[in-house]
Amino acid sequence: MAKILVAEDEAPLRGHILRALAANGHDSVSTADGGEAIEALAGHGGRFDLLLTDIKMPVMDGIALALVAARDYPGLAILLMTGYADQRERACGLEALIEGVLTKPFSLAELNRAVGDALRRVSRSKVA
């Protein structure tokens, strides 16, 4: 299926996300912060279909990561996650760059739906 980069600083949540993605046939790589995510993107030649990133993380937050990823890897789908209302508001200015924002806590069904929707939208835009 898709190759997904997950940037999430909370290890238990990161593990749940990786298991859910694997159960749906996705190949995932995980990082604990935005700095590691930038290294992973570069190390894999940007060959990811989706970046799923928390907004509030150490080293580099998800907003900064999304801006760099969108600039350096056009065509990469970006989906943000947050449990904070003020962080969700910060993401509002990024509509043109991201596929959406998942509000924590979210169910596995919500995660799977958001990932599937993001991948479909990006796939359609690559064809158009």
Where are these regions (language model features)?
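Acidic catalytic/metal-coordinating carboxylates
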Residues: 33-36, 61-65
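Conserved acidic carboxylate
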Residues: 8
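C-terminal output helix
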Residues: 106-118, 123, 127
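Alpha4 helix (beta4-alpha4-beta5 surface) of REC/receiver domains from two-component response regulators
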Residues: 64, 84-102, 109, 113
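Active-site beta3 strand of CheY-like receiver
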Residues: 46-52
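Receiver (REC) domain active-site loop signature in two-component systems and cognate sites
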Residues: 57
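Two-component/phosphorelay signaling modules centered on CheY-like receiver
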Residues: 11-29, 118
